[in-house]
């Protein structure tokens, strides 16, 4: 296994451990992921450094999900399906972000720089879908971006807590985004 692949696996395990044990010390986190405290200390010397490293890594992975989803090239519905599946493939990082993101992180230039372009890419995708008539135009592209993120994070968290099964989450998320919860198509009132 390459060093990068080993670091990737360690980061994912640490992200999950930090969600499962939010107040754990570095020593407790090391034990939870099966490495020595010295190994974890060489990787990150403080908990704050670990959070920053995980935030930056999560941003890189999430931005790669956008590229892998082929948002510009694939047909819009297929791209949406790809986007959901790509995000679900990295559910440990999604949950880590959900539990560890704080509004003051937007003041940290290094973290925000790593996220540069993420929302804008999603906004552009939803705008393309609106122009093609796939997505509603009475909801802004920015709002659709926020809805996508909310649906994915809430479904991943519900699975983590045992409320819903993993099977079918992608389909549920896609159907919610495309059709909402209405049993019938909306009619003009």
Outline where the language-model segments fall.
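N-terminal intrinsically disordered/low-complexity leader segments
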Residues: 1-8, 185-189
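Short, amphipathic alpha-helix enriched in basic
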Residues: 4-31
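HTH DNA-binding helix-turn interface
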Residues: 18-23, 41-52
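Central "turn" residue of the DNA-binding helix-turn-helix
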Residues: 33-34, 45
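Key DNA-contact positions within bacterial/archaeal DNA-binding proteins
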Residues: 38
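Hydrophobic alpha-helical connector segments
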Residues: 53, 64-92
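Amphipathic alpha-helical segments used for helix-helix packing
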Residues: 81-109
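Hydrophobic/aromatic-rich alpha-helical bundle segments in the mid-to-C-terminal region
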Residues: 99, 112, 131-175, 186-189
